[in-house]
Amino acid sequence: MDKQQLASTVNKVLDEMRQRPIPIGISSRHIHLAAADYARLFPAQPIQPKKALLQPGQYAAEQTVTLVGPKGRLNNVRLLGPLRQTSQVEISRTDARILGIAAPLRMSGNLQGTPGIRLISPFAELELSGGTIVAQRHIHMSPLDALILRVSHGDSVAVAIEGSDRRLIFDNVAVRVAPDMRLEMHIDTDEANAAGADAAQAWATLVTKP
């Protein structure tokens, strides 16, 4: 096989890899807590992992809280671990309407100017001064995944949701690259419902490049 044939074969394999299915994680409403806020809501209670998530070291905990807004409340909202530097509440647009909170669309961690919310646990209540967002849809990936897919951290791409009877293309999907990340697209329950997506059966494919 000469160099031209080898290059052609490599490019063909890479093109096939770029079309491989991307797993979908459907994010229900959940919270992340800073250590001090966790200690106040769950005094002397160690975090109890309930289910491991696809991203390494991350998990859904046994602990839940109630979210309370000006217009309503949402019960049994799951805590995700491990603990973070800053508390954050992630909800859908539908949840925001129920609560009566004008939660902005943000990437995780971009919390400046976000509204607060009241959290109630079985042990205590806590009023957060900010940190409530609707999470922007995004894809986690490793540097190798990014190299294969020809994207970079911070890029915005379009992604097709496949495997349902309501195939949908989402624009403005943020790319998040880190060495410890596994390939996975995250959408919220509103977005999953719009696409008729079930995490066990649906998948995503990259359809445009930045």
From Swiss-Prot:
A Pfam cross-reference name: PTAC
GO molecular function: acyltransferase activity, transferring groups other than amino-acyl groups; metal ion binding
Annotated residues for binding of CoA: I26, S27, S28, K71, R78, N193
Keyword terms of this UniProt record: Acyltransferase, Bacterial microcompartment, Metal-binding, Transferase, Zinc
Record-listed phosphate binding positions: R84
Disulfide bonds: none
CC per GO annotation: bacterial microcompartment
Subcellular location(s) of the protein: Bacterial microcompartment
Pathway(s) where this gene product acts: Polyol metabolism; 1,2-propanediol degradation
Binding site for Zn(2+) 1: H30, H32, E90
Main function: Involved in 1,2-propanediol (1,2-PD) utilization within the bacterial microcompartment (BMC) dedicated to 1,2-PD degradation by catalyzing the conversion of propanoyl-CoA to propanoyl-phosphate.
Protein name: Phosphate propanoyltransferase
Encoding gene (name): pduL
